Structure formats: C-alpha cells, structure tokens
C-alpha cells in the first residue's frame, strides 16, 4: 500500500520562473506543477498538495511559521497524511525547519526542501531533490 504524502508549498526560488520581460525570477510554479515534474511520483506515493503561500522566503515571518506548524499538526491529527514535504525558499529555510522541529507535535516525518535555481533556469535543481 502506498503512503500518502502532503506537499505544502510556501514559495521561494523552488516555485519561481524567469520573467521574460525583466529577466528576474517571479512566483509562477504551483505545488501541482512541482509534483507533476517528478517522473513516476505516483509509483512511490499518493500525493496531494496544499498551497500555503507563494512568497520569497525572506517574507516568511514568525507568524507564518506558526501557522505552518499548526497546519501540519492539524493535518496529521486528522490522519490526512503519512508524511509531509514543505517546499521553501532557501533564505530562511533553516529557520523554518528549526521552528518546525521545536514546535510540531506530530511524530510523522516532515521534510523541508528548497532550490537554488528557479524552475525555468538551466539545470534547475528542484526536481533532483525528489529523487533522493
């Protein structure tokens, strides 16, 4: 029986593509897009996506971290998942991961991951993380 994993998106570079007009990265990739880009993901697990936010990680406030922790515990208590993957920007990823480690009540696994390159950049690295 396959496990059920919930991917919770928060934004960051992992959810950005290059804007053709400005050349800068802008939020443009949904959690569904990220999940669809992982080959044969459905062979490993049943995956659902919760779009929590889509902001640069520098905007991840203590209040947002608290809300994220509460959401994960709520979904866990409801028996909605066997584990969680949180996609996050790298600027504050470690702060959020530490906060979750200290605040979560659930014993279910929570993986916090990000990317250094946007989804449309050459050798984008977000998909490689899902194969580990």
List the model feature ranges, each with a label.
Residues 1-131:
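Active-site histidine-anchored catalytic micro-motif
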């Amino acid at each position: 029986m396959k496990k059920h994993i919930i991917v919770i998106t928060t934004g960051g570079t992992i959810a950005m593509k290059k804007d053709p007009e400005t050349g800068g990265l802008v939020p443009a990739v949904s959690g569904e897009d990220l999940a669809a880009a992982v080959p044969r993901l459905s062979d490993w697990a049943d995956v659902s996506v919760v779009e929590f936010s889509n902001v640069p990680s520098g905007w991840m406030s203590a209040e947002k971290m608290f809300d994220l922790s509460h959401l994960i515990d709520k979904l866990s208590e409801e028996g909605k998942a066997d584990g969680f993957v949180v996609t996050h920007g790298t600027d504050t990823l470690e702060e959020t991961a530490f906060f979750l480690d200290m605040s979560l009540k659930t014993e279910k696994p929570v993986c916090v991951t990000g990317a250094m390159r946007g989804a449309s950049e050459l050798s984008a690295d977000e998909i490689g993380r899902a194969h580990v």
